[in-house]
C-alpha cells in the first residue's frame, strides 16, 4: 500500500498581523513534521489572514520568494516534507495575487497556484493558469476557496491529469457560505478533495464554525471545526484512493 500522511493546519490567523501568522505557521509546521507527514497544507492566505488589506493595506506585499519565504524554505528542507502555503504575492509587473506556493521536501518552490475567482478579494487580480503540481509522481490540483464554487477550475485540473484536489480555504457558514460546492466538485471529477479551512473572526466574516474536510464522491469522510489552532492529521491510501484513518488525529496549538 502506498500511504500518504497529510496534515491540515486549521489555523487561527490574525488579519494583518504578519509576524504572528508567520510564527504560528512555523510552529505548526515543526509540530506536524514530528508526525512524519508527507504533505502539510495551510489555509488560504495563512500568512496575512483574509481581510488584512482593511488593516495594513497592500504596500507590504512582496515578490516571492521574499526573505521570510526563503527562510521558511530552509525550514521545510530541514523537516523533509512538502508544504502548500497560502500567501499574497506581487508579480514582477506589480499585480497582486492570492497565491498558494508549493514547496518540496528539498525546500524548492516547485509550483504556484493563483486564485482564479478573486472577485471578492478587492486587492487581488485573478489568476489564469490552472496546472496541477507534480508531487512525487502525484498530480495535485489546488482549488483556492471560491475556486470550488463552480466546476470550471476542478474540471480543468482533471483534464490535465490531476489525481487529488486540495482546497486551501477561508470559507465559513453564513451568507455566501459553502453550500455543497466542495462535495459537488468531487462528484464532478471523481477526485478526492482535502479542504484546509481556518478559524477566528475577521473584520466582517467569522470562521468559528468553518470546517476542514476530507471529501470523496460527494461525502464528507472527516470534518473538524474549532475555536483554536489545530493540526489535523490523517492517512490516505494512494493506490485505492481511499481514506485509511477513521478520524483526524487532532493536536491543538
Give the ranges of each region predicted by the language model.
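Active-site-proximal beta-strand elements of phosphoester/diester hydrolases
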Residues: 3-15, 41, 99, 112, ...
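Conserved hydrophobic/aromatic positions in well-ordered beta-strands
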Residues: 7, 101-103, 213, 232
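Hydrophobic residues at beta-strand termini and immediately following loops
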Residues: 9, 113, 133, 196, ...
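Cys-nucleophile CN-hydrolase/nitrilase-fold catalytic domain and related Cys-dependent amidase chemistry
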Residues: 18, 27-105, 172-191
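Short, acidic/polar
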Residues: 20-29, 148-155
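Conserved residues at the C-terminal ends of beta-strands
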Residues: 43, 48, 116, 168, ...
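CN hydrolase (nitrilase-like) catalytic-core segments centered on the catalytic cysteine
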Residues: 64-84, 149-232
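Active-site catalytic loop in hydrolytic enzyme cores
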Residues: 91-160, 174-180, 184, 188-191, ...
